[in-house]
Amino acid sequence: MTLTKSAVLILVLLLAFDNFADVQPGLITMGGGRLSNLLSKRVSIWFCASRTCSTPADCNPCTCESGVCVDWL
């Protein structure tokens, strides 16, 4: 494929994606919110799972289960 044809193909694909994003703003926003929520839950699990506990107060905001802090999702 020549350089000109490649450039035209890339331009067409970019314009098609731009039109899709304009037509579907709710879908794009909803997906971003889900991803953000998922990342915060993973950080919470990692933070809680690395700690040991003897009482529930040791794990705030997590819970103490069998001597380990956990966060049930």
Swiss-Prot record:
Propeptide residue range(s): 24-40
Membrane-spanning parts: none
Molecular function terms from GO: ion channel regulator activity; toxin activity
One CC-aspect GO term: extracellular region
S-S bridge residues: C48-C62, C53-C64, C59-C69
Annotated tissue distribution: Expressed by the venom duct.
Signal peptide region: 1-23
Record's keyword terms, sorted: Cleavage on pair of basic residues, Disulfide bond, Ion channel impairing toxin, Neurotoxin, Secreted, Signal, Toxin
Domain of life: Eukaryota
Compartments, as annotated in UniProt: Secreted
Function description: Probable neurotoxin that inhibits ion channels.
Domain writeup: The cysteine framework is IX (C-C-C-C-C-C).
Record-stated family: Belongs to the conotoxin P superfamily.
Name of this protein: Conotoxin Lt9a
